[in-house]
């Protein structure tokens, strides 16, 4: 009696960068010949990952985070690789076994935030303005003019030229949020932001400006209880990295990733006749993968009571 062939028993197929590039080059009728070919392909892959962030929510890049809110602090840094926030709540009585509650906090625009008459009013936050910034750290001409202790909330600089009225700075390895500028002083500073540690800084320490993605809440948190800002976000896809790295992409997107890279590489070659075919293959592969990459929970729409029976 013939025996049935056995399966591999594994489900771990993946490709590293070198294999991905080789497959993509073969699809355009070529092969990797030089180190520059590999470098060019890696650059194209990173550009394609940036484009994917513009195509909607990629489920594998979703994660969650928690920010402990502090009385009097309006703005809090998000991780540097944040693309956008998908949902958010204000948590009260955090870590309580019986009284913890997640309460709605509404996202508002910069225009709405600008019209708030008293931005430092304190209470439980009910609105949030999300600043989708580029995470760049830029040098300034400023230096520390007077020694800074680890608990100081006022910092004197040699100059504040180029610094906005409020924002984040980096001195040595510490990120600091300052609430306002008065003369050459930064006032109402909150120390050790963005997972850094408050430290002392000597006269002459260089000051960098950090354009961090962040959230600004209103009202400003009070001290009635401990509040947490709990969020779910979409992060950037990790860089392609070196030749032995696998990509930060689920296996379902491997065909799409290779088809996309082949299309990008095809645009760099002299054989433009293949380009429409490569684009069609990429579009089809993306559509198949994207259709599967979504939540499958049921959606229920309920009209507001005020609109039921309305003649409008």
Q: What kind of feature is each model-predicted range?
A:
Residues 1-138, 208-312:
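Glycine-enriched, solvent-exposed interface loops adjoining structured elements
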């Amino acid at each position: 009696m013939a025996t049935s062939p056995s399966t591999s028993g594994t489900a771990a197929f993946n490709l590293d960068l070198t294999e991905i590039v080789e497959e993509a080059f073969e699809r355009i009728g070529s092969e990797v010949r030089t180190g520059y070919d590999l470098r060019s392909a890696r650059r194209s892959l990173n550009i394609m990952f940036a484009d994917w962030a513009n195509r909607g929510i990629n489920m594998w890049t979703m994660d969650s985070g928690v920010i402990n809110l502090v009385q009097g602090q309006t703005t809090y840094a998000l991780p540097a690789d944040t693309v956008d926030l998908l949902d958010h709540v204000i948590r009260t009585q955090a870590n309580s076994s019986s009284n913890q509650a997640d309460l709605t906090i509404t996202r508002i625009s910069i225009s709405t935030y600008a019209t708030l008459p008293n931005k430092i009013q304190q209470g439980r936050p009910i609105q949030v303005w999300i600043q989708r910034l580029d995470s760049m750290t830029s040098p300034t001409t400023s230096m520390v003019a007077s020694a800074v202790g680890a608990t100081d909330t006022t910092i004197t600089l040699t100059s504040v030229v180029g610094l906005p009225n409020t924002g984040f700075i980096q001195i040595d390895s510490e990120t600091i949020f300052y609430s306002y500028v008065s003369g050459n002083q930064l006032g109402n500073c909150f120390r050790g932001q963005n997972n850094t540690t408050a430290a002392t800084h000597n006269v002459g320490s260089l000051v960098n400006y950090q354009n961090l993605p962040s959230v600004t809440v209103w009202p400003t948190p009070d001290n009635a209880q401990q509040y947490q800002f709990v969020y779910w976000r979409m992060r950037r896809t990790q860089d392609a990295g070196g030749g032995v790295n696998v990509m930060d992409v689920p296996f379902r997107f491997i065909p799409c990733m290779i088809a996309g890279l082949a299309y990008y590489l095809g645009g760099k070659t002299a054989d433009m006749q293949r380009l429409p075919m490569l684009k069609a293959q990429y579009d089809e592969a993306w559509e198949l993968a994207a259709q599967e990459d979504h939540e499958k929970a049921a959606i229920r729409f309920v009209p507001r009571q005020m609109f039921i029976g309305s003649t409008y």
